[in-house]
Amino acid sequence: MSEKLDSYKLMQEHQTWTSKPASLEEWQIVNEWAIAEKWDLGLGDTERFFNIDEEGFYLGYVNDEPVASVSVVNYTDEYAYAGFYLVAPGARGKGYGLRLSYDAFRHCDKRSVGLDGMPEQEENYKKGGFVTHYETSRLVGIHNQQVDAPDGVQNITADNIDEVIKFDEKITGYPRAALLKDWFSGEGRHGFVINSGDGVIGVVGIRRSTDGYRLGPLYSENQAVCDKLFAMALAQVPQGTQVTIDAPTLDLGFINGLKKMGFEEIFHTFRMYRGKEPQGEKHKIQAIASLELG
């Protein structure tokens, strides 16, 4: 629907459309929508998201009532990430999400943009210039095994966070210091790192979420490192608790291992880019930090 047609429809219905960046407090309505959709949000994630680009979280309003959300967060002068594409249940099918996207995407200007899109939206994103690169599987399982903390794994602390951030940039292809500086610390949040003589060779984070725990990111240079970090993360989780993992299909061995443990894929997304894809070492990603911001 064009903006002119959409505006005409709103006028015919005596409705007024506005959109603007939301404050952290105003964004809480989006968290409520996401929880209702079973997104299993990481507790404390929102505050860390706003550390990156507090002007990148948009709400659309009809007659001053919030009806839609989109985030377009500028990580660097060259790269942005889009997420939180949501429309309030009673306002769907009216073009509000698409209209808000037009408004919000002005924020990223000429930057390349990444997103994890649901399959039903893939064609719409393609019309906007996005290209599909690979899939990400949302896997969920109940942690029922006794796991002992392995040797050779260190906590992520203020003393080594800079090394972790540099490793993350090597893997993802773009700097995320604003996101990661507090990602592994705080109530219910844990981060672990493995070093070799040449520096960091693996990182994992795990945090409380609305439905249990979310694990991510998980990056590793080899299978042995992956196994140790995964075990260390699970050692933080009480038995009988749900664990959620967003795993790119670039490492099918990791995904198949999860399924053997009883994890089930409940949906998948498409990682899409408009413009240049960041040039990292994505084949070393077992789990991303979040679908919402990459």
Swiss-Prot record:
The keyword Ribosomal protein does not apply. GO terms for biological process: response to antibiotic. Keywords: Acyltransferase, Antibiotic resistance, Plasmid, Transferase. Coiled coil: none annotated. It comes from the Bacteria. Transmembrane segments: none annotated. It catalyses: marinoloyl-CoA C + holothin = thiomarinol C + CoA; pseudomonoyl-CoA C + holothin = pseudomonic acid C--holothin + CoA. Pathway: Antibiotic biosynthesis. Acyltransferase that catalyzes the formation of pseudomonic acid C-holothin (PAC-holothin), a thiomarinol analog, from pseudomonoyl-CoA C (PAC-CoA) and holothin. Accepts linear CoA substrates of different lengths, including propionyl-, hexanoyl-, octanoyl-, oleoyl- and dodecanoyl-CoA, readily converting all into the corresponding acyl-holothin adducts. In vivo, is probably involved in the biosynthesis of thiomarinol, a naturally occurring double-headed antibiotic. This is Holothin acyltransferase. It comes from Pseudoalteromonas sp. (strain SANK 73390).
